[in-house]
Design a protein with these regions (language model features):
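Conserved serine/cysteine hydrolase catalytic core
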Residues: 155, 165-209, 213-229
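Conserved HGGG/HGGXW glycine-rich cap/lid loop of the alpha/beta-hydrolase fold
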Residues: 11-52, 70, 88
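Conserved alpha/beta-hydrolase catalytic His-Asp/Glu region
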Residues: 133-180
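Conserved acidic catalytic loop of the alpha/beta-hydrolase fold
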Residues: 54-70
Length: 251
C-alpha cells in the first residue's frame, strides 16, 4: 500500500506518471527530478502493457493506495490507460497527455492511428510469440532512434532501445471502455515530428477533448518529453495549479 499523500507535501497532489509501449518508467526521470524538487509526491508506474483493461485495472488498484487528489500523466499508450483507469475515481483532478492517446469509447490505438498519414511504427516492429498464441511487440533496436526518439541523444536512445518493454499486440486493437477526458480537465503536449502518433491525430485528440492548453513542440519526436522534461513538468504543475491547488486556495 502506498502512502503518498497530498498533505505530506503542502497539499500538493500526487503526480502519477504512466509510460507507454517500448519504454519503461525511467523515461520519466527528468520529470520526476523536477517534480520532487518542487515538492510534489510522484509515482512513476511500471505499466504492465498486457492490455487496455488489464493495465487500467492495475493502475486503478494502485490509485486506491494513494491518498488525496491525483494528477494522471500518460505517454503514448499510457494515455489510453489513464483515460480508462480514472473512470469512477473522483480524486483524479486532471489528465495530462504527453505524446499520448486520448481515445473515445470503442476506439483502438491501431484503428484511429490508421486513419491518419505519417505513422511509421508498423514498419519498425518485431514480434515474438508468447505461450497461448499471443504476440509481444518490440521496436527493432536499429530502427528505434529514428522511429521513437530522434530528438534524444544517440547514447540515451541506444539505452532506451535496449531497455524497452514490449506491449502485447492485442492491446493496440482493444477498444476503449471509458473516455474520462470528457469530464476531467485535460492538458496536451506532443512533438511535431512524432512518427508513432501523427501530429494531425494529436491535434484532433486535443481539440476533441477541449484541452485547457495544448503545447506542440517543433522538431519533437514521440519521446519529446525526455529532452523537454522542463516543459512537461511545467504543464503538469499548471494542471495541478488549475485544479487541485486552485480549489484548495478557495477553501
Amino acid at each position: 500500500m502506498l502512502h503518498l499523500t497530498a498533505s505530506s507535501s503542502g497539499d500538493k497532489p500526487t503526480v502519477v506518471l504512466v509510460h507507454g509501449a517500448f519504454a519503461e518508467s525511467s523515461s520519466w526521470n527528468g520529470v520526476v527530478d523536477r517534480l520532487l524538487g518542487d515538492g510534489f509526491p510522484v509515482v512513476a508506474v511500471a505499466n504492465p502493457l498486457r492490455g487496455v483493461q488489464a493495465d487500467a485495472d492495475y493502475l486503478a488498484g494502485l490509485l486506491e493506495g494513494i491518498e488525496g487528489p491525483v494528477v494522471l500523466v500518460g505517454h503514448s499508450y499510457g494515455g489510453i490507460v489513464i483515460g480508462q483507469a480514472a473512470e469512477g475515481n473522483d480524486r483524479v483532478a486532471a489528465l495530462v497527455f504527453i505524446g499520448g492517446y486520448a481515445l473515445d469509447v470503442g476506439e483502438t490505438a491501431a484503428g484511429l492511428t490508421g486513419q491518419y498519414e505519417g505513422g511509421t511504427l508498423g514498419e519498425t516492429l518485431v514480434a515474438f510469440d508468447l505461450p497461448g498464441g499471443a504476440k509481444d511487440l518490440y521496436i527493432a533496436q536499429d530502427k528505434y532512434r529514428a522511429q521513437f526518439s530522434a530528438d534524444v541523444s544517440e547514447l540515451e536512445s541506444a539505452r532506451m532501445a535496449a531497455t524497452q518493454r514490449p506491449i502485447v499486440e492485442s492491446a493496440l486493437n482493444e477498444p476503449v471502455r471509458a473516455a474520462t477526458w470528457k469530464t476531467i480537465p485535460s492538458w496536451f503536449l506532443f512533438g511535431e515530428l512524432d512518427k508513432n502518433i501523427p501530429v494531425a491525430l494529436h491535434r484532433f485528440m486535443a481539440e476533441r477533448a477541449g484541452a485547457r492548453r495544448t503545447v506542440e513542440l517543433a522538431g519533437g519526436s514521440h519521446s519529446v518529453g525526455i529532452p523537454e522534461a522542463a516543459q512537461v513538468t511545467e504543464l503538469i504543475e499548471e494542471a495541478a495549479a488549475a485544479t487541485v491547488l486552485a480549489t484548495a486556495g478557495d477553501a
